[in-house]
């Protein structure tokens, strides 16, 4: 296995997304491709709490072809396309409870030459400092939809423990009523790869 450690067990993801999101900070996100392996330490996440969360795709238990995977077991990969960018989420909680955590930013680790080739002409800080940027840099695509985050080619291992974690409102959800103010965005305080 090309990553630096074993994938975290499925039990790690079997908790509400607001508990999982801060725990993912510092973990190592690994993507294996034919070109090689790219990895980055997760430094920013957002929790989406499902049926009661107006900002969640699954608000009101809305079940569509796109959101179907959110209703499956924890640890499934939920990718979707927004403004031509693929965004990556990890399903949390349990079967029938459609919660997920969006991976918003990562600090490049392994395979930086791959990231540079996938994000040419960009400063290294710009490779992975946003949810669409990090998927492009790491080679994460819609082909990863529905896979398990506990096994290659896309998985998460232990990384580092952040010294400080900050919280605040999620980004880009202005039309979601009171949910836009929930402090469900988490980031490693002071990390230069955080999106904003």
UniProtKB/Swiss-Prot annotation:
Q: Which UniProt keywords apply?
A: DNA damage, DNA repair, Hydrolase
InterPro entries to which the protein is assigned, alphabetical:
Formyl_transferase-like_C_sf, MPG, MPG_sf
Query: What Pfam families does the record point to?
Result: Pur_DNA_glyco
Q: Name one GO molecular function term.
A: DNA binding
Q: CDD domains per the record?
A: AAG
EC top class, in one word?
Answer: hydrolase
Q: Which residues form a coiled coil?
A: none
Which terms under GO biological process does the entry name? Answer: base-excision repair
- In short, the EC number is 3.2.2.-
Q: Which family does it belong to?
A: Belongs to the DNA glycosylase MPG family.
Q: What is this protein called?
A: Putative 3-methyladenine DNA glycosylase
Organism, as annotated: Bacillus velezensis (strain DSM 23117 / BGSC 10A6 / LMG 26770 / FZB42)
């Amino acid at each position: 296995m090309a990553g630096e450690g074993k994938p975290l067990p499925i039990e790690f993801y079997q908790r509400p997304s607001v508990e999982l999101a801060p725990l993912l900070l510092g973990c190592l996100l690994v993507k294996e491709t034919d070109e090689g392996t790219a990895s980055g330490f997760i430094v920013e996440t957002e929790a989406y709490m499902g049926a009661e969360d107006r900002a969640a795709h699954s608000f009101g238990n809305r079940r569509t072809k796109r959101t179907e995977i959110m209703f499956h077991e924890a640890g499934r990969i939920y990718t979707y396309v927004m403004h031509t960018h693929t965004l990556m989420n990890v399903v949390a909680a349990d079967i029938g409870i459609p919660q997920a955590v969006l991976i918003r930013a990562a600090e490049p680790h392994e395979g930086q030459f791959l990231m540079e080739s996938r994000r040419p002409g960009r400063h290294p800080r710009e490779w992975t400092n946003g949810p669409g940027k990090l998927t492009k840099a790491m080679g994460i695509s819609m082909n990863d939809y529905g896979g398990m985050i506990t096994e290659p080619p896309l998985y998460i291992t232990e990384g580092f423990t952040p010294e400080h974690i900050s919280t605040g409102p999620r980004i880009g959800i202005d039309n979601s009523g009171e949910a836009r103010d929930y402090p469900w965005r988490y980031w490693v305080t002071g990390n230069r790869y955080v999106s904003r």
